[in-house]
Amino acid sequence: MAIDVFYDDDADLSIIQGRKVAIIGYGSQGHAHAQNLRESGVEVVIGLREGSKSRAKAEEAGFTVKTNAEAAEWADVIMLLAPDTSQAKIFAEDIEPNLNDGDALFFGHGLNIHFKLIEPADNIIIGMVAPKGPGHLVRRQFVDGKGVPCLIAVEQDPKNNGRDLALSYAAAIGGARAGVIPTTFEAETVTDLFGEQAVLCGGTEELIKTGFEVLVEAGYEPEMAYFECLHEMKLIVDLMFEGGIANMNYSVSDTAEFGGYLSGPRVIDADTKKRMKDILTDIQDGTFTKRLVANVEGGNKELEELRASYNDHQIEKTGAKLRDLMSWVKVDARAETA
């Protein structure tokens, strides 16, 4: 099924230019949205909690910084870019009391709306503008006259102008230079969580760790296992990123390609696919979100325990030692966060 893609010619930039936008949060996405909007002629303020360490950065960049509540009261478009686990509290305490008829509440990710952790009144536009890239890339591409593709969605549209507003916002941060793709809160939320859990974070992490363990337990040096199972992952992913899986197979040796075809399905088999479907079900029916909320309400105890156990793995100690030999790794990391 073909998807619609919208570009600058499809967007009316004057719509968002006629609004007052509050960016709640000044992290990776927040700083990029705010600066790109401002340079597109949009009036922007930053909303931060009292004592936020990001305040100095926002003020240094020339923004007016208000409390979350003050920013929400001032604005008629509020983009909530605080962490997912903080959003419901910020909404209840600071945003909801300051919403007026026709205001728009935008998100960069759909979790809190789709799973009804946040439920604005019926007279509020609920929308999403989600660049498919980290904030530093959104900013850098904008400065270079380009853009990062964006997803947009509208969950609630009392005045039938939400989609035009979301498209205008996406254009103002550079998204329509590359392409803006309409979706739904449900599709964005479920696919994003599934990708993180089954493939990008959870799946990849366990694959790397298990491969490392198999080699070390077979008597091979941890350093060799690290190089082969983790370090070279970037080389392979970069090839897939640039041209797809076929490009990766074309670029590696015939030995690697042939071995991959034979052994890949032995690692990721029908049972793995079934368990991935179980993960998808847990996401769709809210099981994961309930556990996420319980973790937050419990003071992040489960998260901290899991983090500590993973950070103590031998692969972390081996990697720290080997990365000290790689001067280019630290240089690349600094460039990505600049």
Curated annotation (Swiss-Prot):
Keywords on record: Amino-acid biosynthesis, Branched-chain amino acid biosynthesis, Magnesium, Metal-binding, NADP, Oxidoreductase
Limits of the KARI C-terminal knotted domain: 184-329
Residues involved in NADP(+) binding: Y26, G27, S28, Q29, R49, S52, S54, D84, T85, S86, Q87, G135
Domain KARI N-terminal Rossmann as annotated: residue spans: 3-183
Enzyme class: oxidoreductase
Pathway(s) this gene product operates in, as recorded in its UniProt entry: Amino-acid biosynthesis; L-isoleucine biosynthesis; L-isoleucine from 2-oxobutanoate: step 2/4; Amino-acid biosynthesis; L-valine biosynthesis; L-valine from pyruvate: step 2/4
Keyword Cytoplasm in record: no
Binding-site residues, substrate: S253
Residue numbers annotated as active site: H109
GO annotation terms (biological process): isoleucine biosynthetic process; L-valine biosynthetic process
Catalysed reactions, as listed in the record: (2R)-2,3-dihydroxy-3-methylbutanoate + NADP(+) = (2S)-2-acetolactate + NADPH + H(+); (2R,3R)-2,3-dihydroxy-3-methylpentanoate + NADP(+) = (S)-2-ethyl-2-hydroxy-3-oxobutanoate + NADPH + H(+)
Enzyme Commission designation: 1.1.1.86
SUPFAM superfamilies named among the record's database cross-references: 6-phosphogluconate dehydrogenase C-terminal domain-like, NAD(P)-binding Rossmann-fold domains
Keyword set includes Glycoprotein: no
Positions with a binding annotation for Mg(2+) 1: D192, E196
Binding sites annotated in the UniProt record for Mg(2+) 2: D192, E228, E232
Role noted for this protein: Involved in the biosynthesis of branched-chain amino acids (BCAA). Catalyzes an alkyl-migration followed by a ketol-acid reduction of (S)-2-acetolactate (S2AL) to yield (R)-2,3-dihydroxy-isovalerate. In the isomerase reaction, S2AL is rearranged via a Mg-dependent methyl migration to produce 3-hydroxy-3-methyl-2-ketobutyrate (HMKB). In the reductase reaction, this 2-ketoacid undergoes a metal-dependent reduction by NADPH to yield (R)-2,3-dihydroxy-isovalerate.
The protein's name: Ketol-acid reductoisomerase (NADP(+))
Gene assigned in the entry: ilvC
